[in-house]
Amino acid sequence: MAARAVLDEFTAPAEKAELLEQSRGRIEGLFGVSLAVLGALGAEEPLPARIWLQLCGAQEAVHSAKEYIKGICEPELEERECYPKDMHCIFVGAESLFLKSLIQDTCADLCILDIGLLGIRGSAEAVVMARSHIQQFVKLFENKENLPSSQKESEVKREFKQFVEAHADNYTMDLLILPTSLKKELLTLTQGEENLFETGDDEVIEMRDSQQTEFTQNAATGLNISRDETVLQEEARNKAGTPVSELTKQMDTVLSSSPDVLFDPINGLTPDEEALSNERICQKRRFSDSEERHTKKQFSLENVQEGEILHDAKTLAGNVIADLSDSSADSENLSPDIKETTEEMEYNILVNFFKTMGYSQEIVEKVIKVYGPSTEPLLLLEEIEKENKRFQEDREFSAGTVYPETNKTKNKGVYSSTNELTTDSTPKKTQAHTQQNMVEKFSQLPFKVEAKPCTSNCRINTFRTVPIEQKHEVWGSNQNYICNTDPETDGLSPSVASPSPKEVNFVSRGASSHQPRVPLFPENGLHQQPEPLLPNNMKSACEKRLGCCSSPHSKPNCSTLSPPMPLPQLLPSVTDARSAGPSDHIDSSVTGVQRFRDTLKIPYKLELKNEPGRTDLKHIVIDGSNVAITHGLKKFFSCRGIAIAVEYFWKLGNRNITVFVPQWRTRRDPNVTEQHFLTQLQELGILSLTPARMVFGERIASHDDRFLLHLADKTGGIIVTNDNFREFVNESVSWREIITKRLLQYTFVGDIFMVPDDPLGRSGPRLEEFLQKEVCLRDMQPLLSALPNVGMFDPSFRVPGTQAASTSHQPPTRIQGAPSSHWLPQQPHFPLLPALPSLQQNLPMPAQRSSAETNELREALLKIFPDSEQRLKIDQILVAHPYMKDLNALSAMVLD
């Protein structure tokens, strides 16, 4: 049922009449309304005069158009919002429908001032809404998060792909590689927008599609550029293209120039055999992130065969968009059973995919095992790149010599093909952009699911294990592997050399033909180390552990070897390597992340015994974020570290323990480990979550450090943290006192939590005194000072079983046979305390201090503490303790 048309009339400034006339077509196309400029109110109206405007259309559309017109005529806010340049395709791609939907949804006027910069103007509410949307887009783009449900994720990818291909332009490929969460947000923005303001006027709809760039305003004048200039800019942009479009054009040129050349599939089948098994191969296709974006590119064997069949029905002509539409139609015809693949198949396909890019199988399996096969392929690619770089750097350090044969291989002219695609002449950003799209294109190669040691098209970082006498046979094969140094990955990436100049060679990950090919290991593939006496079968086992890939000519030699014999006495390192996983490298260096994950494999259980604690200890306030990040080596938020710290103070007798952690840390995050400890501590009432919430994708979180200081101030407790709270020193006097005297620092040695014996330095109190409540000692001071020659700070004061307590609080001398774990807190001993009440009853009441003595003590204290802040405190102490005559005891009270 069509919406009832309404008529609305309102006024606008007369000087905006020209702007409204120029923007009429764009406003009508955006909101599906008819706009009429009626004229001025009258000559008697004082300047500036206003003119009448009339809107006709659906009620909601008229309301939105009215808000938009008010915003461009009398804007309340004018803001500029930045975004990553890689997100430029969102605002100009898909015929600018996303930008139009954003304007329709917020009623704010958006114009692209430059790549990475948007101009926003309109009413205050509209500008705030538009900025919130854009900031949320940026957040989703930078986080690259997956959707919680894999089925929902595939549906979002399919719908977004169909939507983008229906409005295809030069930015289609860039839109298809956006993160899935951002795709879902864009679909939500555009869903129903086309039908919301639909009026049935075909001309209006056609104008919305054809005049996509007319609404782009000039940043200097605020007016729309003319249609002729827009057309010229559009043609210039089509000619210039993007890194993705340039790569696609080069691929089209290569394939169109050599139509008879087909890429040999990895499974080694002929084209006829491949056509017969086409259905079986389709069932093995994995609909991953890369697959959903654009399947069956031009250099896929399946696509070449389908292009011959569909030549009469559709004209492909190297058009990427037509190819994408064929792929989407083909994927829709597949049944749900065919689309679903097992986890093992997905894992094998993902491993083979990264192997074709030139990475070793060990590194790929290691990274996938850590992050999981459901992670975004781009994130996996980044981690594999980092791991490969670390591995190659470590291997370069172990390489002893450089062999002169590298100069021979350099001059063999392997990269002399005119059709090869290199990135030497492109800038760095273009290289990175091209690499992402090369990932998408290589994902379409028809590789088999079964993992093999090495196949014809498999590009793996390998050691050369070919004997010298067999080298000429290998160089005579149809595809040769040359070990070259990759300047971007700092690693070895074998390059494929084709005997025919017509074939295309793809340089792996931006490798250059000018880079010297330096084999980091000798020709026999063994490390430059003194070897023990081993049989040949043990050597081959070592080579397999190193990830070697031997040539087909060396396979018969391996098959004739005898079965391996156990040699625990001769080679313990080999037996250890066998017990390790297949992804472990014997010569790879250990990283902090690896060591941390190894410690997580050791089980730990938080056990707090149900027994009474001590009442003389201060409240313990733990900075949970600081403790967790420290235990996680500044890379992970380790909840185990918080549990270890709580258990440490619980064993000391503390029962008043509070841990503060931001609430957003309880969400699912791969960098937050063992979150069940947070749940356990929260159930015990030890964990307190500081408030945090999400508003339009932006996190609004309270500062947890303020909660720490507030609680320590109210309870007189100690804050366990390594933070110095420098920004809160001047907040208040009480907070400064907490930061100065009540911060307990710590350290972790693996899973061992350690605190210092002297938290305030060598001249400060010991740990047991630091942890005790101050009220216990303060109540004793008047009584002890009244006793003859007995005082807390008197050198003659002795506690049985301990040393004399001096003002310097020097630690007691360690005994020769004492254990080395001196960092553990010592239990305080006060055997004199029970005898104090009876002692007080037998002694006469001491005489009160005279006014002269009070003045002398006050002057002496003012000389010691000249600050004006402490003068008031000195007067309060002297009034509160009229019997106290000991200057040392009074000084201690001032310091407290």
Curated annotation (Swiss-Prot):
A Gene Ontology term for the protein's cellular component: cytosol
Site (described: Cleavage): G200, D201, D326, S327, D490, G491, R509, G510
EC class (word): hydrolase
Positions where Phosphothreonine occurs in the chain: T242
Biological-process GO terms, alphabetical: cellular response to UV; innate immune response; negative regulation of cytokine production; negative regulation of proteasomal ubiquitin-dependent protein catabolic process; negative regulation of protein ubiquitination; negative regulation of viral genome replication; regulation of innate immune response
GO molecular function: mRNA binding; RNA nuclease activity; ubiquitin binding
Tissue specificity field: Detected in heart, lung, brain, liver, skeletal muscle, pancreas, kidney, spleen, testis and ovary.
Upregulation: Up-regulated in response to interferon alpha (IFN-alpha) stimulation (at protein level).
Activation and inhibition: Proteolytic cleavage by CASP8 or MALT1 leads to its inactivation.
Domain RNase NYN: 617-769
Modifications after synthesis and translation: Proteolytically cleaved by CASP8 downstream of TLR3 or TLR4, leading to its inactivation. Mainly cleaved at Asp-490 by CASP8. Cleaved by caspase-like protein MALT1 in T-cells following TCR-mediated activation, leading to its inactivation and subsequent viral reactivation during HIV-1 infection.
Free-text note on domains in this protein's UniProt record: The CoCUN region mediates binding to ubiquitin. Does not interact with NEDD8.
Function, as annotated: Potent suppressor of cytokine production that acts as a regulator of innate immune signaling and inflammation. Acts as a key negative regulator of select cytokine and chemokine responses elicited by TRIF-independent Toll-like receptors (TLRs), thereby limiting inflammatory cytokine responses to minor insults. In response to more threatening pathogens, cleaved by CASP8 downstream of TLR3 or TLR4, leading to its inactivation, thereby allowing production of inflammatory cytokines.
Family of the protein in this entry: Belongs to the N4BP1 family.
Protein name, per record: NEDD4-binding protein 1
Native source organism of the sequence: Homo sapiens
Gene name of this polypeptide: N4BP1
